[in-house]
Amino acid sequence: MEKVAVIYWSGTGNTEMMAKYVAEGAKAAGAEADVFSVSDFSQNQLTEYARYALGCPAMGAEELEDSEFQPFYEAVKPALNGKKVALFGSYGWGGGEWMNPWKADAEAAGLVLVAEPLAIENAPDDAGKAACQDLGKALATA
């Protein structure tokens, strides 16, 4: 089974929690999965993995976090063309609309989304945990 990198940025810890659950799901499906905060992941590590879960919460006016995550995403996007990817993140208000332009951008860049992006309001509850694990399983088995 191919290796999965779960890479996230989290301000409150909610998206970090989601990242850990996504990795649990990938591991339960038989994949090797590693979790990284965006600041701890080097672009050079991309070649070590075949599948990627990218997590970022909604920030400001329903957009990706722009000081660390957005620059990272823009830098790695060309290398992820044709790769299997899952998108996830948390939000505190609004309806999670930031995920729609992110999904469209990822698809336009050639990322192969294995499932609908997962947006969870605040911290994941038991249903949110299960949804994160299901996303990880989908990524591992797609």
Label each PLM-derived region with a short phrase.
Residues 2-3, 14-17, 21-38, 48-142:
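FMN-binding flavodoxin-like domain, especially the glycine-rich phosphate-binding loop
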Residues 8-12:
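Aromatic-flanked redox-active Cys/Sec active sites in thiol-based oxidoreductases
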